[in-house]
Every structure is written in structure tokens, then in C-alpha cells.
């Protein structure tokens, strides 16, 4: 009897001892719609995954806008003229529903281009056509769509890569699995894409810059500030036009000087930003 009592007492004391638990990390709710290379650290992966989700959101809204309004949309006609909507719908739909297996975003700078001043990333081209590198600069300069139409941003006066979503949309179109050789670079800047549309040229629905501007403007008009948006420039305030007409002469001189140093695989965007493939 004493032995039984002693055994029960020992069991009770053991059961009362606190058990050591190893906390398990919570599952990250942020899932990237496209593969991210292990060279991206934990914070880069989360930022990039969130940014790619926003890119899909931007493309999906652009597609939905066209599906609902078609050529009756004034914003559609502004960017695509009288071109049929089928091609533009497909260009956005492949971002949303395309197979992501042959796409990879990485952060380890294998080609050394992130060391170049002003580079936020680049498509690897012949080195690895299915891969795009995102440089450190992107993580400190790109904005979320939640800030659309704030902090002075306007569609016409700011670069398309102000937002992660606009920048990554461009980078995705460089990849063969997405652009498929049908989406190319035909126009530069806001004025350039409008000129392309005014001529009703076929390239408008195949131009990566046009696809970015349209997606950003319909998101601003439909979502960020419904029914108003934030186009900026003369379209919002004709009184500002005279103040801005004297500046392009200096910009042209800077562009001419910059063109002498531009590598063959690069082109400049409005504002002088260099984009290389």
C-alpha cells in the first residue's frame, strides 16, 4: 500500500511540472501569386509577395473595367483608341490567370546590374529569360496602391513605376510566359501613349507602357477616388499649362546628353529614368 501511494505521489509531481513548449511560427497569410527565389530574405519576400498580389489586383480591375464598359469607356478610348478590346483584355487576364511556373523573381543580383545607379531591377534576358531581379532600390522607393492619388501623385505627371503594381506589371510583360513577344515597348511616357492611341495604331493594345497607364488610371478613377481619379496636368487644371510649357527645353537637353551613354539593351522613360532588359 505504501509503495502504491509513493508511486502515485511521484506521478502527480511529474504531471505538475511545467512542460516546455516550442512556439511555432504562424503561417504567413501573404501568398505570392508568382514564385520568389530563396535569395530574397524574409522581409523582401513579404514585400515582394504583397506587391505581386497588388499587381494582380491592378490587372484584374483593368480587365473588369474593359469587360463592363468595352469601347464605351472614355478612359479606354483615351489609351487604346478604337482598337478592339479583346487584346487588352487578354493582356491583363494572363497576369491574373496565366501559369506562373515559368516565372521567377530573385534578389541576389547575379548579373551585377543592381550596382548601377538608379536600377530598381531588371529582366535577365539571355542570361535567364524566365527570371527578373528586384534590386534593393525598389524596396525603398515603390509605393502601395493604397496610397493612390495621395502625396501629390497624379497619373500624367508621375512615373508608372511609382507603385509596385505598375512597375511589376511592366516587368512581367518582359517575361516570355506573360508577354509572349506580343507586348513590347512602343511609346514612352504619358504623352507618348496618348499619341499612340490618337493614331489608332495597332501597337496601342500591345504597348506595355499603355497597359500600365490604363490600369493605373482606371484604378484611380474607379477605386481610389471614385468618379474623379487623379489624372493631373491640364486635364484637371488648365491654368497650370502655361507654367509647365517652359520646362521641356531643359529636359530635352538632358535627354540628349543621356542618350549618348545609354547601353543598347536600355531605353529611357519620361523623366529620364533608365530601364534596361
Swiss-Prot record:
Keyword Ubl conjugation belongs to the record: no
Superkingdom field: Eukaryota
Intrachain S-S bonds: none
Classification via InterPro entries: HRXXH, MetalloPept_cat_dom_sf, PRA1-like
Regions of compositional bias (Acidic residues) in chain numbering: 233-263
Signal peptide range in chain numbering: 1-16
Biased composition (Basic and acidic residues): 264-277
Protein name, as recorded: Antigen 1
Species annotation: Emericella nidulans (strain FGSC A4 / ATCC 38163 / CBS 112.46 / NRRL 194 / M139) (Aspergillus nidulans)
Organism classification: Eukaryota, Fungi, Dikarya, Ascomycota, Pezizomycotina
Originating gene: aspnd1
Amino acid at each position: 500500500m505504501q509503495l502504491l501511494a509513493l508511486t502515485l505521489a511521484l506521478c502527480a509531481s511529474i504531471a505538475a511540472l511545467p512542460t516546455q513548449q516550442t512556439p511555432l511560427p504562424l503561417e504567413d497569410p501573404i501568398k505570392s501569386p508568382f514564385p520568389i527565389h530563396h535569395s530574397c530574405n524574409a522581409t523582401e519576400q513579404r514585400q515582394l509577395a504583397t506587391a505581386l498580389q497588388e499587381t494582380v489586383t491592378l490587372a484584374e480591375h483593368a480587365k473588369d473595367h474593359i469587360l463592363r464598359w468595352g469601347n464605351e469607356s472614355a478612359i479606354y478610348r483615351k489609351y487604346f483608341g478604337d482598337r478592339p478590346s479583346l487584346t487588352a483584355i487578354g493582356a491583363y487576364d494572363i497576369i491574373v490567370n496565366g501559369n506562373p511556373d515559368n516565372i521567377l523573381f530573385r534578389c541576389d543580383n547575379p548579373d551585377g546590374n543592381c550596382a548601377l545607379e538608379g536600377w530598381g531591377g531588371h529582366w535577365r534576358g539571355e542570361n535567364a529569360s524566365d527570371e527578373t531581379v528586384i534590386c534593393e532600390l525598389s524596396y525603398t522607393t515603390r509605393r502601395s496602391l493604397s496610397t493612390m492619388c495621395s502625396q501629390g501623385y497624379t497619373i500624367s505627371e508621375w512615373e508608372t513605376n511609382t507603385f509596385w503594381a505598375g512597375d511589376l506589371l511592366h516587368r512581367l510583360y518582359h517575361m516570355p510566359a506573360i508577354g509572349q513577344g506580343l507586348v513590347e515597348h512602343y511609346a514612352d511616357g504619358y504623352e507618348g501613349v496618348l499619341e499612340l492611341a490618337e493614331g489608332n495604331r495597332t501597337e496601342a493594345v500591345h504597348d506595355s507602357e499603355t497597359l500600365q497607364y490604363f490600369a493605373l488610371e482606371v484604378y484611380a478613377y474607379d477605386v481610389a477616388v471614385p468618379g474623379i481619379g487623379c489624372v493631373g496636368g491640364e486635364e484637371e487644371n488648365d491654368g497650370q499649362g502655361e507654367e509647365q510649357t517652359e520646362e521641356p527645353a531643359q529636359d530635352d537637353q538632358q535627354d540628349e546628353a543621356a542618350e549618348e551613354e545609354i547601353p543598347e539593351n536600355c531605353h529611357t522613360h519620361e523623366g529620364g529614368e533608365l530601364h534596361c532588359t
